[in-house]
């Protein structure tokens, strides 16, 4: 509207011209007419039909009758069944007169006053001609009714109404009946669109309602038949069925497949037009799958569905009570199949009361089972100690409580008492695969370091490496089996002693390796300690070369290898080992989940304190890497008293003793106090 005003401040184009004017252009949807095509274009462009309709409806009440008469008379003259050439000529003259009158009225805005005049003129003109008064009345009254029906549609119905108009001209009683309609016609003209819908709806809505009424006839039985059969029994179970059907039915593989077909009947049924055939296609899938199984078990299906559906959530042996009609065997076997995912627990074979206990025990037993696979132990041996208190990791790995679980060492109780306590902790940690792996890493790295330091590193290193692995594995599982298996440890010690006799360099590292093996495994014995004491002098002589050897750096690959870095140097002797192992290697072992390296026998410790004071003077050269590692380990040195002392004795090195003797004693005393 604003754009139109800006372009042309003329009178609005969308207002229809005065009724009598011959219009070249007319709107399809509304009574708007204009001689200028651009006006009609704008009218259509801006959707001004509403405005024109409102204006026309206001004017129709006043002016439209003359306009309609002129228009309709022109149209009737064109029709083949027009009354006669005389009335057509009269209508043309009358229309011209009305056009002139209407133009003047529109310009002067005297439409209301001029309407009766034009109406009277129409009647006089029509009466002057030979038309009979009823025919004239029909001409005057009929067009508005026809126009009322004709104008709103402007499409197909117009021709029909014109045909009706010709037929009505022939019969006077019809004209009189139509003459009663002008009021209706005028009212329908108010909105050019509303007059059409009333007959249109009346014609079409009735069949629509008939169709709709027929549709609910089909839909209602569908909806009514649906819920009782499907939603109560089949619908909900179908969702949960894959676990439940094998329970309820005796291990039928088809049931898990058919659980989805249960849902399939939902989709086709609403599509089926008639309600009566519904139960037949519904029953067809039921008869294939259910008639033999579920229809026999209808009461059981509810329980089988609603109770066991919880089963997948209690996958570990917490078996939901079986359906009342089902034997426990069926349910348990059927529930096994989904739960094979969890091999450790066999929940189906456990009744609900026993499920917690047996599962707990079985899960405890599983780590030893894995240990069996590692060490190829017999099942009975590995499982023997698993649930017992000795293997329970009550104390923290850093500070295991030695007093909680004391296991009597079989052959060596008398040697030292603390070894048993540390053994219990070692058993605890041996249970843990992570700690076991860490111990293996430490021992392996220690052996590698000692071999690297030794001249015979090429072959012996590999052997000792493999031996260290086997020894630690055996030790871990021997601890789980029995409090102490010193048989293999004694063998290792004997091997190491023989090696020390044969190769002095190799013996130093071998003894260090032995002690590394013995300490985490609590195999330190006075006999072995005395043997090492005899060897200490030789080892001291040999150590400077070994400690300074560069390969020590290779051991610093993992956090667990801190002990190895110092342990390669530890081959001084048990005297020196007691000092520095307590400081460094034990710290690394504590970091290894405190695999409870066996405390050196107290007798040896008591024998060595004087020698320990002497040792720092004797031992001088040392690799800087070993010093750094020792300082780090000493700073990290932690709460394990006896295990620390043994580990520290392993980490002894000459130069570090000369430098840090005071610090080492302080660290040594701390673990002793604890």
From Swiss-Prot:
This is Zinc finger protein 750. GO terms for molecular function: DNA-binding transcription activator activity, RNA polymerase II-specific; promoter-specific chromatin binding; RNA polymerase II cis-regulatory region sequence-specific DNA binding; zinc ion binding. A zinc finger (CCHC-type) spans 25-51. Its main location: nucleus. Keywords: Activator, Differentiation, Metal-binding, Nucleus, Transcription, Transcription regulation, Zinc, Zinc-finger. One of its GO terms (biological process) is cell differentiation. Residues 105-125, 370-466, 594-674 are annotated as: Disordered. Zn(2+) binds at residues 27, 30, 43, 49. It comes from Xenopus laevis. Residues 401-411, 444-466 have a biased composition (Polar residues). Transcription factor involved in epidermis differentiation. It is found in: Nucleus. InterPro entries: ZNF750 (IPR039363), ZNF750_Znf (IPR039064). GO terms for cellular component: nucleus.
